[in-house]
From Swiss-Prot:
Annotated SUPFAM superfamilies: Nucleotidyltransferase (SSF81301), PAP/Archaeal CCA-adding enzyme, C-terminal domain (SSF55003), PAP/OAS1 substrate-binding domain (SSF81631)
Enzyme Commission number, as recorded: 2.7.7.19
Region (Disordered): 475-522
Protein name per UniProt: Poly(A) polymerase
Protein species of origin: Entamoeba histolytica (strain ATCC 30459 / HM-1:IMSS / ABRM)
């Protein structure tokens, strides 16, 4: 069964194929050379020294999935530019950005204006990169710089520390995994990442799990169950976390000196290992937590069946979830810009604000469920992105979402680069072009880059079956057009969709009822 699992992961691009390994290696090498030359030029101009001055003013440290060797065929590269004291964040965010605009090897360059981790995103030599920045106190970076030595954090501000901790966290996680369990760790991380994406519970900006939180969760389970094979480890993963006391017990690797300071940050805590620790699960809300817990329970039941009965139908575990199923009301966001290129370049600004919106909605007592539908829908012909938040509310109560919604809109509409409109839609009003097997072939701007504390900016192209009201009839019609062979499969589809809806909808009002009581003050 372990072999079949790995084969399934390979088929779903969770391993690099063909020449991708060499292409990524060359792109990293060229990017490192470019940044070192850029840093030296900035230093010479700022310090007024001779052009032949021997100084190492900047270099690159790769981290995340690539550094841990858990990257897939289409994975991007996370990298941190570590500089000397001469180079400033403005030199990086604005100066380097301006230079890269004129670099013929760079495409889809964009600034991601996250308050927690502003960074640059691009395609360089046909490889997706996300670059952030950390400034050290060194005049010249030593060749043998010890990235894990806490002295490196001296005189760093919060953004610098957070950026370099992306590298430090990766190295600590790598060291935490026993040597003989490295391959099991890589298989498990790929498995859980694919599972979360297929089941619609992946993405920091969508208030779900991100890359580093998955790596920490997996490393913790493996450290205590290193004797198990891959399938048993997967079963143990679901068993442990489906019964975890998330509200009281943080997940952390070993001891954590920052535990007392971090235990009140966020609904749950998945603490990064490098000091100062961050909560990798800070964006998760009480609503998205319930969704994650339901999916963990489902995963446990399926993998236990595989393990106990010798079944290896891995497609069942990774079957895409009907993302719109179970919600009566949606907030629809239509995002436009001056051009399609401008839209894909600046969509990160919209996504970076979703966490605060969802946290605001989670504080409204009348709302019993509110989650982002992960990823947006790109309407290339009309140059628009569509995003949705699914909601259910208590019966017979007025509902006012003005405060969080208007606050969100004021922020994302504050510049000239984006125009965001919001409206309330019943499930039956979701555009039919998004209703059946929608393929979101969206460029890299879809997601904001995931680290322990920054938001992601890479995209995934995924196919989900998304029902609208009347969802079952419409879905069956679509399936009939694709030649469903028999009545048994139709009935199975009905059963699956009703089950998914019933896991969410409890004591919720209908969409028509909600529309009568909904309040949004402009």
């Amino acid at each position: 069964m372990a072999c079949e699992l790995k084969e399934f992961l390979v088929k779903n691009d969770m391993y690099p194929m063909g020449d991708q390994v060499e292409k990524k290696r060359k792109a990293i090498s060229k990017m490192t050379e470019y940044i070192q030359q850029w840093g030296k030029k900035i230093y010479i101009e700022s310090a007024g020294v001779a052009d032949d001055t021997d100084v190492k003013a900047a270099t690159i440290y790769v981290y995340g999935s690539y550094r841990l060797n858990v990257y897939g065929n289409n994975s991007d590269i996370d990298a941190c530019i570590v500089s000397n004291s001469t180079i400033t964040r403005d030199d990086f965010y604005d100066g380097l950005y301006a230079e890269l605009l004129n670099n013929p090897d760079v495409k889809e360059l964009k600034q991601i204006p996250s308050k927690r981790s502003p960074h640059l995103s691009m395609i360089y030599l046909n490889i997706e990169f996300d670059l952030n920045f950390s400034r050290t106190a060194y005049t010249s970076l030593p060749d043998n710089l010890d990235i894990l030595n806490e002295n490196i954090l001296k005189n760093m501000d919060e953004l610098d520390t957070r950026a370099i901790n992306g590298v430090r966290n990766t190295d600590i996680i790598d060291a935490f995994v026993p040597n003989h369990s490295e391959e099991a760790f890589r298989v498990m991380v790929r498995t859980i990442k694919l599972w979360t994406k297929k089941r619609g519970i992946y993405g920091y900006v969508y208030c779900f799990l991100n890359g580093i939180s998955i790596e920490i969760l997996v490393a913790q389970v493996i450290s205590e169950n290193y004797q198990l094979d891959n399938v048993r480890l997967l079963e143990k993963f679901f068993q442990v976390y489906s019964s975890w006391d998330w509200l009281r017990t943080p997940v952390m690797l070993g001891t954590n000196d920052d535990f007392n300071d971090k235990k009140k940050e966020g609904v749950i805590q998945i603490l990064t290992p490098a000091s100062p620790s961050e909560n990798a699960a800070f964006s998760i809300t009480k609503f998205s937590l319930e969704m994650i817990k339901r999916e963990l329970k489902r995963g446990q039941e399926i993998v236990h069946e595989f393990s106990s009965e010798g079944v290896n139908d891995w497609a069942k575990l990774f079957k895409p979830r009907h993302l719109f199923c179970g919600y009566y009301i949606f907030i629809e966001f239509i995002v436009t810009s001056s051009s399609l290129e401008g839209l894909t370049t600046t969509i990160g600004k919209f996504e970076s604000g979703l966490v605060n919106l969802m946290k605001g909605l989670s504080e409204i007592e009348e709302i019993i469920e509110a989650n982002v539908i992960p990823n947006g829908f790109l309407d290339e012909e009309n140059e628009k992105y569509f995003y949705y938040v699914g909601m259910n509310v208590k019966r017979d109560c007025p509902v006012d979402i003005s405060t969080p919604l208007n606050s969100f809109l004021s922020i994302v509409n504050s510049g000239k680069d984006l125009i965001v409109d919001a409206s309330i839609k019943k499930r039956s009003e979701i555009p039919t072009k998004f209703a059946h097997s929608v393929k979101r072939s969206i460029t890299k701007s879809q997601e904001i880059k995931e680290t322990s504390s920054q938001v992601p900016s890479s995209a995934i192209t995924e196919t989900f079956d998304i029902p609208t009201k009347p969802s079952i009839e419409q879905q069956l019609k679509a399936k009939e057009e694709n030649s469903i062979p028999n009545e048994e499969k139709k009935e199975q589809l009905k059963k699956e969709m009703k089950q998914e809806a019933n896991t969410i909808v409890k004591n919720s009002s209908t969409d028509d009822d909600f529309m009568k009581r909904f309040t949004r003050k402009n």
